[in-house]
Amino acid sequence: MNLPFKIKYQIFKFVSELYGLNLSKQKKGIRILMYHSVGTPVEEDLYNIYNIHPELFSHHAEMMKNHETNVISLTEKNIYLAESGIIVTFDDGFANNFETALPILNSYNIPFSVFITTNYVKEKKKHFLSKEQIKELSNYENIKIGSHAMNHVYLETLDKPALYNELTGSKDFLEDLIGKEIDAISYPNGSVNVRVRDICEE
């Protein structure tokens, strides 16, 4: 185990214990573990904060399993009735979510969700999920496919027509692709306000 990996692992262990993410007696409330890339450096990510080494990611999964963490799937009904738990998500739709993260999480029977920036798929952008991979992911009962808009933009900055196009364009593309309703979104860059939420709920 190299030094950077040791440091990252110890930081995760400290933070997870501090917030009760990996403990059997978990603190109340639902927490989200949001990942992006697993093993592939991300463009313009100078400090490599959006990419996690597969070995470290496997440790995360192992800790959740060993400590009997309540990992909640967004495919479950009435998930918000849970007193405590963790939701595992991936933003953007990197191909390694399918190639690397899926086998690891499946080995521990951990459900997860993938929020996809659909124009990355349309443009066949390097390192991102293909249509075929998205279809295969959607066939798993414990995997939720959601929207991350069409482009990775700040939704709050868009006028109403552009905002509507971003949201409905992504939703329509994914629904046509997998043949299932898309009823979940992760807002790109965390950019959301009342206007954005209202259009999402329409």
Q: Which sequence ranges carry the predicted segments?
A:
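Metal-dependent polysaccharide deacetylase catalytic core of the NodB/CE4 family, i.e.
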Residues: L33-T40, L46, Y50, S84-I86, ...
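C-terminal domain-boundary segment and adjacent tail
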Residues: I49-A82, E175-L177, E201-E202
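Non-membrane alpha-helical structural segments and their capping/turn regions in soluble enzymes
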Residues: P54, S58, A95, K160-N165
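Extracellular/periplasmic catalytic domains that process cell-envelope and extracellular macromolecules
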Residues: S24-K28, L81-A82, S107
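Noncatalytic alpha-helical scaffolds and linker/capping helices
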Residues: D91-D92
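Membrane-proximal basic amphipathic "stem/tether" segments
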Residues: M1-S37
